[in-house]
Amino acid sequence: MNKPLLSPQRPVDCPCGGAAPAARPGAATEAPRFAQCCGRYIDGGEAAPRALELMRSRYSAYVLGATDYLRATWDPRTCPADLDVDPTAPDAPRWLGLQIKAFAESDADHATVEFIARYKVGGRAHRLHELSRFLRGDDGRWRYVDGDVNEEQALIK
């Protein structure tokens, strides 16, 4: 059986650090493989089944600089025209981890995900704490709409 080859820009372990949707509760807590976790949405064209998986895949897309995926999963009414994510830029954040705090579906087409994303820029550690809102479109795909952001900054010693 041939194994799929990952492109040089794709990690083996998933940047989101979360459990792949098929993972069993109580299973070993090692990072899931990118191809089975967020890669199937970012590279495989599969639609995220819930806003939670979409949130995780969007975090991974920021880590990897997958701007096209971010645009495709952002509600066109709120997506910034100048969205461009380049993780190799000198002032780009270096993403350190994602923690999901809460996930709720208010109905079949509306959901929220509260998360904390840790990153560094210029020697300073940051925590992006956001309550994100998601909407399922007429095509059945979840999209990020907007969020309430609380950003904290701490000097690395």
Language model regions located:
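Short Fe-S-cluster ligation motifs
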Residues: 60-75
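A short, polar/proline- and glycine-enriched secondary-structure boundary/capping micro-motif
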Residues: 48, 123-125, 153-157
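Short solvent-exposed beta->alpha transition segments
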Residues: 72-100
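Short beta-strand edge/turn micro-motifs at domain boundaries
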Residues: 129-157
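Short Cys/His-rich zinc-binding micro-motifs
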Residues: 2-3, 8-31
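Short, aromatic-enriched amphipathic alpha-helices that serve as compact interaction elements
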Residues: 49-63
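Surface-exposed, charged secondary-structure patches
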Residues: 90-127
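Cysteine-rich micro-motifs
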Residues: 31-41
